[in-house]
Amino acid sequence: MSERNLPGGEMSSLILDFFWLADCSGSMNGEKIQTLNYAIRQTIPDMRKEADDNPNASIMVRAVKFSDGAAWHVPTATAIEDFNWTDLTAGGVTAMGMALELVAGELRQFPTDTKRLPPVLVLLTDGQPTDDFKKGLDELLLTPWGKKAVRIAIAIGKDTDLDVLEQFTGNRELVLEAKNPQLLVKFIKWASTVVKNVSAPMVGDAAGGGIDVNTIPTAAADDDEIW
């Protein structure tokens, strides 16, 4: 575990694991996947600033992509200071359950120590699972860190299964409906900022613990409604 030299002596750094879970199915082709790629790239400077402002927590980022199957897009936990985003392309179906299983397998390897903050999982999708979503979710929630995780879902467009996403988040307020490109960018940027809340001293086991839902962005009067 990394340590940082701080004024007043050496102090162990807490680890905050951040996971993007991105739908790359065929229905995401075009503006949706382009906007997703753009928005995630835009989050990087703000997340780096948050890491600078909170030297007691190390933000480590991973990413999963899912379509016909699920695979690591960023397989190695990468410090936000070194993190870069490679654009995704779209095609295939929506193996959301497999994506959750992949993350569950990673969380299962985490030690149950006090040097880790609850992980943040951000799921982005525009459709419905085409595989066994419940199996994947059950595996995730059976892991101690999966149960403690702050789980946020961003529904892209009007065809997303909101009930499925609420099962993932455990909190309807953390299912964000992006009906246009402007809202998708706003929601992705907002989701990246929850690291500030999670790194606060008190975070409960419940999904969304410590997150101020009043800060979730809303649509502007001039936003398009095209999805």
Which residues are covered by each model-predicted region?
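Acidic, low-complexity intrinsically disordered regions
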Residues: 1-227
